């Protein structure tokens, strides 16, 4: 037994006979984990063998009980050196398991605890009745049981269940018997009730007229039950923790899910909260008619429910089986003041305040408008990302939005010395002093010790040390922090005498302190209080001295510095020790300054040492900044930008001089308790606060509830102190004749939302200032957060009632309204599109268009071409879109010149001008022939052909040349709208390899100062919020049921967490304006090393005002380029109607394999757009044979409710075919126009359908469209299909993707080894080289293994990706090609290489081997062979683990461990 274990056993008073037993002979404590916040101690014990069950229970009882006395929860687990046990011991521990937290759920315990177990030599077997031996218990409970047995010391004991037939029959018989008894009892109770009712009726007086009645009136019984339900007592949800009957809850629904069973019954699973907790509910409806009765069960509705609380197998938690339900009225908070007496909130945060506030700007504005407030100000922390949404919502709500932010203000330079004089630093006498206080507020806390060392040339020549009695007992926190007790201060000199003596002590010296602003501020406040002169002599702050001498140090506190410079500090936070240590540091700093910085004079400390970037370490003070007019808007954009891109250090900072330079059009408020005016008032008194408040335009005061955490932090004594601070702030305003505004520091809307903010804030950990703890050791806890909900006018007046009615009304209502009137309306988001100016852009677009059109179609142009170009150019040039087209054309051309194709996305392929100038390959004209020799053309305009690629080959009748075929029949309206004025969104797919170059092209074309990455805002996702809730639950000893966890996670989600950038979006600012006309800028995720700045606003907020280019990276262009490099074939010359390629969609014969060999009936594996399981299934069902049908498939697979439950059924039932169903959005307009509808109506119907609005528009509007379609013989199935669609894919997008896919497919058919090489190099996501190079049998076996895992839902994401790779490996091998092994001297770093009919994998295909190491291996082998494994590790940078893997796979051959020649290196 170890000494530590023995000591623990003695402490918990373990019985002597157990301590002396053999099982404790070599017991030990392996580890103890202490969780301070949750007060949990986890013990990990080691024993020579398993403990007898009675010893285990004794140990558990005594350990838990002993620690409980200290309010600590103790748990333990055991590692047994020898695991040997009997069935009896196994059964004992099995019973014990259900007393442990892991296994004590009611359903598990009730079903399993009485079962028998035995050990069969390899597993513990549980004999169970058949209905218990099911997947639910296996998946949800057996793993817990295995885990618990591991904690008992049984190691990795496998557990399984077997069905016991006898037990099953016995339980069935028992159940039937009990059921009969229950039915009999129920009948007896019913008869007794009827007899009692009859007895009452017999004893009642006879009525004048007797009407025969039934003995049992069902409707009356329901009515009585309902009356009882409405009067029933409401149970708070938090009080229900076990199964109970006839419980009544009231609450709000926050989650609803409806399901229909195979029998047609409906289940409504919903969750409600009453804000004490939450509960899962379940309500059944027998049919559709009954289901309609429960339409009130919807998200946000308030209900009263009654039912039984049961453990539910489906929800896996306590769930109410709802019997009665009723919608109730929820009385929301209202602003009760008259309409002309409503306040204005001037300090409100939205969910854009990073990890700090909850409401969306829309919800804040809506609430203010609902309450009748005339205006509301938005003041997020250091950002303005809510401005655009706030601007739009305020206009909609008819309320004035005042736009602002709560800024982090810092001084430009923080001085080292104050009150400088011309003095030789090395001839001066210094008084190095420190004070100890009862708190941080000079105005509210007391001095309790002043200590100082008078020093000359590094020697202490005199000391001062006096305690001061504050006149009240010291707090436990003060005593614990400083070591000063009431005995130290009791009987000490009067404070006036101590202050006078200290002033005398300091005469003629330089004062020195660490963080001198605090110590000097405290001294001056006390000097002023006792009418003594303030400090005027020089002061040196060693904190700033250290920061400027040693900026590379992370911490400059007294403790870290004394450790670094080996200066003794015996009792930190006792003034005498701190002062002496600070003095020793001072002379170290003076020596460094003299010898290495040439600083010898006091005047030089600030001029030579204070760094230009000292603002980075300056203390942050909050200020609220508001936009008064349009000039102010641009200035606030500039301030936000500078704070993020130039002055960012931990947070976005605004140096005071920068604020001064941009103050026009802005108004400033003093902000919260972190503002400098409040801090000065707290620390130095009202006069200091008045001096600082001159800088501001108004004074903020907040409700006492906002300041209460300061009491807990010992900054303010009590509620009276809070009220006095508020009165003092009002006095500051009165002295300066500045308005005082009552503001709410709003962080959430409803009081009950407080918990969500608590969870978000606490997730930041103790490193966040807001979570800094109060107290020390185990008792340390963060201060409570303030009650920061959005208050109504009457609630705000109540908060300030202590001021008297008139003064409260003045600061809450009068002043806020008067000040709000000073703000002009501003245009945050512009109403027009502003594109860059490019010289002759319109002419160049027109010239390029006509030049290409003449080249293809001849001059003069066919009328159909000429009219289309004329129509498009009128829209493009007339609306200022030419620059957008020209910019895209230049980018595509540059990428083409670098050897890459560029694919188009979205609906840009609907524009024929885009086709002609080279932006897209998709030709949107009707299907047509055109002669490449004489330009003669023929157009098919009757809708009989869906794609020009499907036209039969034909020779030109004029010159005999084979016609070229083209045209996808896509109307221009689908790109720029029916009126051609919609801002074009041109999305382009560049090769991932070429994407960085394309991004730089934008800078080159438009200028770096006008090109920015499109910014994004990342918010807390619900899964992340779930983790925050569980962490909060753990750290703060909370216990939430699953429904409450879900509710809290939902409430905490959506808060801004970080910023980022769109993967391909670049915003271009017009070169006749600057970016601050539209948005501030910043770096993504505050990464100051990023190559690009981003828009501060989410790019969607300004995408209709500036040019946005989507320059996305995509695999298809990369793949095409790779295939071109391998084959030398120009992909643009590949015909899209290659008959062998089309055979891939109907079978596998063209690949030379069978369905059985490759596991799929078509050749779709690895073909872009068509290779997923979902689309392969569609191909199998439809067997497309034309390009037009492939477009249909692409549209059907990308749309929502277009295929499943819609087109799929129509095709199966023979109502429609693949070519006639609705596939792409554009087909609707084209089909309806061919049917005879007017273009405008055809366009409008298409827009309604593609956006899923068909069933949301008014019935009159919808009926009008239906009638028009029927009048033109559009079939009913087509109309019904329109009503089911939620989203549709653009045909131009489909055409671009299918065209790329067919080019890839061409190589798969005709040049297979090139195809597989390109696929594995670019598209494959996972590799398993050992399997891939082991031949067909190994590949098929691994695929079977993953398939079986998928069926059990056990396959990992990596295995799923690997399966896709192996499908292609299998196909390649079945086609007669080989997969080689990784080769140390032949493999490429990143690409597969071809050797005859074999693919050699690259180094990056090895699991765990990254690109950098792969390239290092290739570089190293160029310098000569590797002579040993050690040399491979050193020269190749390969880890030992990878070397072992190489060796296991036979890659290293007979390479020795060490280079034998190296043994003799020292001799040469």
Curated annotation (Swiss-Prot):
It is found in: Cytoplasm. Residues 197-217 are annotated as: Disordered. Its main location: cytoplasm. One of its GO terms (cellular component) is cytoplasm. Residues 430-586 form the Exonuclease domain. Its EC number is 2.7.7.7. It catalyses: DNA(n) + a 2'-deoxyribonucleoside 5'-triphosphate = DNA(n+1) + diphosphate. GO terms for molecular function: 3'-5' exonuclease activity; DNA binding; DNA-directed DNA polymerase activity. It is an enzyme of class 2 (transferase). Keywords: Cytoplasm, DNA replication, DNA-directed DNA polymerase, Exonuclease, Hydrolase, Nuclease, Nucleotidyltransferase, Transferase. GO terms for biological process: DNA-templated DNA replication. Gene3D superfamilies: 1.10.150.870, 3.30.1900.20, 6.10.140.1510, Metal-dependent hydrolases, Nucleic acid-binding proteins, PolC, middle finger domain, Ribonuclease H-like superfamily/Ribonuclease H. InterPro entries: DNA_pol3_alpha_NTPase_dom, DNA_pol3_finger, DNA_PolC-like_N_II, DNA_PolC-type_N_I, DnaE2/DnaE/PolC, DNAPol_HHH, DnaQ, Exonuclease_RNaseT/DNA_pol3. The keyword Cytoplasm applies. Required for replicative DNA synthesis. This DNA polymerase also exhibits 3' to 5' exonuclease activity. HAMAP family: DNApol_PolC (MF_00356). NCBIfam families: dnaq (TIGR00573), polC_Gram_pos (TIGR01405), PRK00448.1 (NF001688). Belongs to the DNA polymerase type-C family. PolC subfamily. This is DNA polymerase III PolC-type. It comes from Streptococcus agalactiae serotype V (strain ATCC BAA-611 / 2603 V/R). The gene is polC.
């Amino acid at each position: 037994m170890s000494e530590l274990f023995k000591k623990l056993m003695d402490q918990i008073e373990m019985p002597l006979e157990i301590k002396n037993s053999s099982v404790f002979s070599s017991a030990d404590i392996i580890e103890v984990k202490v969780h301070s916040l949750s007060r949990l101690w986890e013990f990990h014990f080691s024993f020579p063998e398993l403990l007898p069950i009675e010893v285990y229970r004794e140990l558990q009882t005594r350990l838990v009980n002993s620690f409980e006395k200290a309010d600590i929860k103790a748990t333990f687990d055991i590692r047994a050196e020898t695991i040997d046990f009997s069935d009896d011991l196994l059964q004992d521990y099995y019973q014990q398991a259900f007393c442990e937290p892991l296994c004590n759920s009611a359903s598990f315990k009730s079903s399993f605890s009485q079962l028998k177990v035995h050990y069969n030599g390899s597993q513990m077997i549980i004999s169970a009745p058949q209905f218990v031996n099911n997947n639910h218990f296996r998946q949800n409970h057996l793993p817990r049981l295995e885990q618990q047995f591991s904690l008992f010391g049984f190691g990795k004991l496998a557990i399984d269940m077997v069905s016991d037939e006898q037990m099953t029959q016995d339980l069935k018989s028992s159940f039937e018997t009990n059921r009969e008894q229950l039915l009999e009892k129920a009948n007896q109770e019913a008869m007794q009730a009827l007899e009692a009712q009859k007895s009452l009726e017999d004893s009642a007086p006879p009525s004048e007229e007797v009407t025969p009645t039934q003995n049992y009136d069902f409707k009356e019984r329901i009515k009585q039950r309902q009356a009882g339900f409405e009067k029933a007592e409401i149970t708070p949800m938090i009080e229900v923790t076990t199964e109970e009957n006839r419980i009544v809850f009231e609450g709000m629904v926050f989650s609803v899910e409806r399901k229909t069973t195979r029998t047609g019954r409906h289940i409504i699973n919903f969750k409600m909260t009453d804000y004490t907790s939450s509960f899962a509910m379940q309500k059944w409806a027998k049919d559709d008619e009954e289901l309609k009765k429960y339409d009130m069960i919807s998200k946000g509705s308030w209900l009263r429910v009654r039912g039984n609380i049961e453990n539910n197998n489906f929800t896996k938690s306590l769930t109410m089986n709802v019997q009665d339900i009723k919608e109730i009225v929820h009385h929301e908070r209202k602003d009760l003041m008259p309409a002309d007496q409503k306040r204005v909130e001037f300090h409100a945060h939205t969910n854009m305040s990073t990890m700090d506030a909850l409401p969306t700007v829309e919800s804040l504005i809506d609430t203010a408008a609902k309450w009748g407030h005339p205006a509301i100000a938005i003041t997020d922390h250091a950002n303005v990302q809510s401005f655009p949404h706030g601007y739009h919502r305020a206009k909609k709500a008819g309320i004035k939005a005042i736009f602002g932010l709560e800024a982090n203000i810092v001084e430009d330079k923080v001085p080292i010395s104050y009150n400088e004089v011309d003095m030789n630093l090395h001839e001066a006498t210094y008084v190095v002093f420190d004070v100890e206080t009862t708190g941080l507020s000079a105005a509210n806390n007391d001095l309790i010790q002043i200590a100082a060392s008078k020093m000359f040339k590094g020697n202490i020549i005199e000391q001062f040390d006096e305690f001061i009695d504050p006149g009240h007992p010291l707090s436990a926190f003060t005593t614990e922090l400083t070591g000063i007790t009431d005995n130290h201060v009791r009987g000490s000199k009067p404070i006036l005498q101590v202050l006078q003596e200290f002033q005398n002590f300091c005469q003629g010296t330089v004062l020195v302190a660490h963080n001198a602003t605090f110590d000097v501020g405290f001294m001056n406040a006390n000097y002023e209080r006792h009418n003594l002169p303030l400090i005027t002599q020089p002061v040196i702050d060693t904190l700033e001295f250290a920061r400027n001498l040693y900026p590379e140090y992370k911490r400059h506190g007294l403790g870290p510095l004394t450790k670094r410079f080996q200066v003794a500090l015996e009792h930190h936070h006792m003034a005498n020790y701190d002062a002496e240590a600070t003095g020793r540091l001072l002379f170290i700093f003076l020596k460094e300054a003299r010898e290495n910085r040439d600083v010898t004079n006091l005047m030089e400390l600030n001029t030579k040492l204070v760094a230009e970037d000292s603002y980075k370490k300056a203390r942050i003070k909050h200020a609220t900044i508001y936009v008064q007019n349009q000039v102010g808007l641009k200035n606030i954009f500039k301030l936000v930008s500078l704070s993020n891109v130039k002055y960012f250090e931990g947070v976005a900072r605004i140096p005071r001089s920068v604020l001064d330079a941009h103050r026009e059009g802005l108004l400033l408020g003093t902000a919260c308790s972190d503002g400098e005016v409040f801090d000065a008032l707290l620390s130095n008194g009202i006069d200091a606060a008045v001096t600082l408040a001159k800088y501001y335009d108004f004074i903020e005061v907040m409700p006492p509830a906002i300041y209460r955490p300061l009491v807990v932090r010992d900054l303010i004594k009590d509620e009276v102190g809070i009220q006095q601070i508020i009165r003092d702030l009002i006095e500051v305003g009165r002295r300066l004749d500045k308005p005082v505004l009552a503001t709410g520091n709003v962080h959430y809307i409803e009081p009950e939302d407080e918990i969500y903010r608590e969870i978000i804030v606490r997730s930041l950990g103790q490193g966040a200032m807001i979570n800094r703890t109060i107290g020390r050791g185990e008792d340390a806890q963060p201060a409570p957060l303030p009650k920061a909900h959005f208050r109504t006018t009457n609630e705000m007046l109540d908060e300030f009632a202590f001021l008297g009615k008139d003064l409260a009304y003045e600061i809450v209502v009068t002043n806020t309204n008067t000040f709000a009137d000073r703000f002009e309306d501003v245009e945050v988001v512009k109403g027009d599109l502003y594109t860059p100016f490019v010289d002759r852009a319109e002419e160049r677009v027109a010239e390029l268009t006509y030049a290409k059109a003449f080249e293809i179609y001849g001059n003069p142009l066919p009328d159909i071409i000429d009219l289309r170009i004329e129509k498009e150019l009128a829209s493009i040039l007339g609306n200022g879109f030419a620059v957008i087209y020209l910019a895209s054309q230049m980018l595509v051309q540059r990428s083409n010149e670098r050897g890459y194709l560029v694919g188009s996305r979205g609906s840009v392929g609907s524009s024929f001008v885009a086709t002609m100038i080279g932006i897209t390959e998709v030709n949107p004209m009707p299907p047509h022939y055109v002669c490449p020799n004489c330009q003669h053309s023929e157009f098919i305009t009757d809708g009989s052909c869906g794609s020009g690629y499907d036209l039969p080959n034909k020779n030109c009748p004029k010159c005999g040349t084979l016609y070229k075929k083209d045209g996808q029949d896509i109307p221009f309206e689908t790109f720029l709208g029916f009126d051609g004025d919609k801002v074009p969104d041109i999305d382009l797919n560049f090769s991932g390899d070429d994407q960085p170059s394309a991004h730089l092209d934008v800078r080159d074309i438009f200028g770096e100062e006008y090109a920015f990455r499109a910014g994004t805002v990342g918010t807390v996702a619900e899964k992340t919020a779930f983790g925050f809730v569980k962490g909060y639950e753990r750290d703060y000893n909370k216990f939430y049921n699953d429904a409450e966890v879900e509710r809290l996670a939902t409430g905490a989600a959506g808060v801004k967490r970080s910023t980022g950038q769109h993967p391909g979006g670049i915003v271009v600012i017009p070169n006749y304006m600057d970016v601050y006309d539209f948005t501030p800028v910043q770096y993504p995720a505050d990464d100051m090393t990023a190559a690009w700045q981003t828009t501060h606003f989410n790019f969607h907020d300004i995408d209709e005002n500036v040019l946005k280019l989507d320059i996305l990276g995509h695999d298809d262009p990369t793949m095409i380029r790779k295939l071109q490099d391998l084959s030398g074939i120009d992909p643009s010359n590949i015909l899209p109607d290659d008959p062998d390629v089309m055979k891939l969609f109907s079978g596998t014969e063209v690949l030379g394999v069978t369905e059985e060999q490759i596991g799929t009936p078509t050749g779709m594996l690895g073909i872009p757009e068509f290779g997923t399981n979902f689309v392969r299934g569609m191909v199998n069902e439809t067997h497309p044979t034309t390009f037009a049908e492939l477009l249909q498939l692409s549209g059907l697979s990308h749309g929502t409710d277009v295929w499943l439950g819609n087109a799929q059924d129509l095709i199966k039932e023979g109502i429609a075919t693949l070519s006639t169903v609705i596939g792409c959005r554009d087909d609707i307009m084209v089909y309806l126009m061919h049917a005879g509808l007017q273009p405008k109506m055809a366009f409008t119907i298409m827009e309604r359908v593609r956006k899923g609005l068909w069933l949301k528009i008014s019935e009159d509007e919808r009926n009008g469209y239906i009638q028009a379609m029927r009048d033109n013989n559009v079939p009913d199935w087509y109309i019904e299909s329109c009503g089911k669609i939620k989203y549709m894919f653009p045909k131009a997008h489909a055409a671009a993707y299918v065209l790329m896919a067919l080019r890839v497919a061409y190589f798969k058919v005709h040049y297979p080894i090139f195809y597989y090489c390109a696929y594995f190099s670019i598209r494959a996501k996972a590799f398993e080289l050992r399997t891939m190079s082991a031949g067909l049998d190994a590949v098929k076996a691994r695929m079977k293994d993953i398939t079986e895992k998928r069926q059990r839902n056990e396959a990992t994401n990596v295995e799923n990706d690997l399966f896709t790779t192996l499908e292609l490996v299998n196909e390649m091998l079945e086609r007669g090609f080989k997969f080689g092994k990784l080769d140390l001297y032949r493999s490429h770093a990143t690409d597969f290489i071809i050797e005859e009919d074999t693919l050699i994998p690259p180094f990056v295909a090895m699991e765990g081997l990254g690109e950098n190491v792969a390239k290092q291996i290739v570089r190293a082998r160029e310098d000569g062979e590797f002579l040993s494994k050690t040399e491979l590790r050193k020269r190749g940078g390969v880890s030992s683990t990878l070397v072992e893997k190489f060796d296991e796979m036979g890659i290293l051959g007979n390479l020795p461990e060490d280079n034998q020649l190296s043994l003799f290196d020292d001799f040469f």
